[in-house]
Amino acid sequence: MRDMMNMMKKAKEMQEKMQKIQEEMANLQVTGTAGGGLVSITLNGKNTITAIKIDPSLLKPEEIEILEDLIMAAYNEAKTKIEIAMQEKTKSMTAGLPLPPDFKLPFS
């Protein structure tokens, strides 16, 4: 009985921590850059693009393909940064919990 109460308490604590982390992640802003800073994309914790900056030198018809590649590279870098931040947050939250190694949390 004592073990069950302890598990329920830990589950409630974990739920509260998860909610806090989700709120923190929603407010997180990361920027990915490409082309030595010619293109930058900022994402929030929900992987929503909040800003795109493009150096005017890339706004030429003959530079379209390069620009497209740089936008994708900047987005992918920003997305990777968000994923790393989420992993770090969830790792600290789940420390000490008996979870299977491949257990996926709902927001990771």
Curated annotation (Swiss-Prot):
Example GO molecular function: DNA binding
Pfam families: YbaB_DNA_bd
Subcellular location, record wording: Cytoplasm, Nucleoid
Main subcellular location of this protein, as a coarse class: cytoplasm
Keyword Signal in record: no
Family, similarity comment: Belongs to the YbaB/EbfC family.
Function: Binds to DNA and alters its conformation. May be involved in regulation of gene expression, nucleoid organization and DNA protection.
Protein name (Swiss-Prot/TrEMBL): Nucleoid-associated protein BH02310
Organism annotation: Bartonella henselae (strain ATCC 49882 / DSM 28221 / CCUG 30454 / Houston 1)
Organism lineage: Bacteria, Pseudomonadati, Pseudomonadota, Alphaproteobacteria, Hyphomicrobiales
